[in-house]
Amino acid sequence: SGNTSLDLENMFLRVGVQAKAVLDPHFQAQVASLLTVNDLVIIFSLSGKTKDTYDSLKIAKKNGAKIIAITNYIHSPIGKSADLVLQTAIEEFLNGGSLAGKISQLYICDLLVHGYEQNNNIDSVELREKVLRSIIDKSIE
């Protein structure tokens, strides 16, 4: 789930949104403590029961941040505490970290980013080209 949050951070960057993926649980709690009603947190937890993630969610919620949870289990502690749950449908625990779980999360991330683009009339082609130009000549001949 942590790697998927990094992917979502990059996806949002390409449409002009400066998002931050925070993987370290202690840093998550610190960041959550500074959030406000103007902030949105997107939480990834296939089980919906990850303690560190849940603890940070509670801190963020206490500060008024809106919470979107991407999880398999809408009735899990994380699912119940979120303002919105986007449900995946993968039995992740069978092999702990399956590609299917990541793909399920990435699909939801793609929908979130495209929804953001549509709702905010974002010219994503122009922004993506701008980002691409920033890295196009990074190879050494």
Model-derived features with residue positions:
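Glycine-rich phosphate-binding loops that contact phosphosugars or nucleotide phosphates
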Residues: 1-107, 111-120
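A short, charged, Gly/Pro-tolerant segment at domain boundaries
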Residues: 122-141
